[in-house]
Swiss-Prot record:
Pfam family, one: RecO_N
Biological function: Involved in DNA repair and RecF pathway recombination.
SUPFAM superfamilies: ArfGap/RecO-like zinc finger, Nucleic acid-binding proteins
One GO term describing the cellular component: bacterial nucleoid
Single GO biological process annotation from the record: double-strand break repair
Protein name: DNA repair protein RecO
Swiss-Prot/TrEMBL keywords: DNA damage, DNA recombination, DNA repair
Family: Belongs to the RecO family.
Amino acid sequence: MARELKEVQGIIFKRQKYKEADLLAKIITKQSGIITLIVKGAMRPKSKLSAATLNFSAGTYVIYTSGHGLSNLRTYKKVQQFDALYRDLTKNAYVSFIFDLIDHAFVEYQPLGQYYNLAVFALEKISAGVDSEMITQIVQMKMLSAYGVKPELSHCVICGKEKGIFDYSIKLGGVICSDHFNVVESRLHLKPKETAILRTIGLLPIERLGTIKVSEESKRATRKAIDRIYRETIDLNLKTKKFLDELKLF
């Protein structure tokens, strides 16, 4: 495919030095997926492109691309900065992990569809001060389908029951009702309200998830469960997740 100028709307989420005065920046876009951009001269003093490619800058960018490999950033039209993320290390760590999680689920230039909307949702909510932990857990639950391990949350994986008391089984790939608790050794032994949280954040569309109020105890339990689901089904070992976990210890 011949190289062409293309206008994309997206969010810069990772950058590193490239050669003496240039940067490599990763941008997540809805239609064109994740793209690695060469940003010429971005390391030079007073470079306008440097400011427009700070992490978590969202806007419209004009790129020179062939649809594969490295593309070049030519200019930008309108860019929004999420200042709250620069002032708060914890918020920044949460958002960095979320974008890293999305990045590892797709190859470059693969359209993201609903997962782009999920990234925007997380960025805006965490920047606005909504519970970072719960927003991250929402993203983690919804990203399981992108990794090919979508859990069954709508009904019991054994009998199909949709209402009642439920627990979660990683081995069976979803929720099980109380009728089968005594025969499923692999269940996580979550409290009913904790399983209900996993079901709610996994099933409800993001636009229907309003103000999230969950106790610290429940958040710790659901975080532990989600981390175990990822560890036993995907095992990503992301540096951003390790940093986030270390940050929570302080």
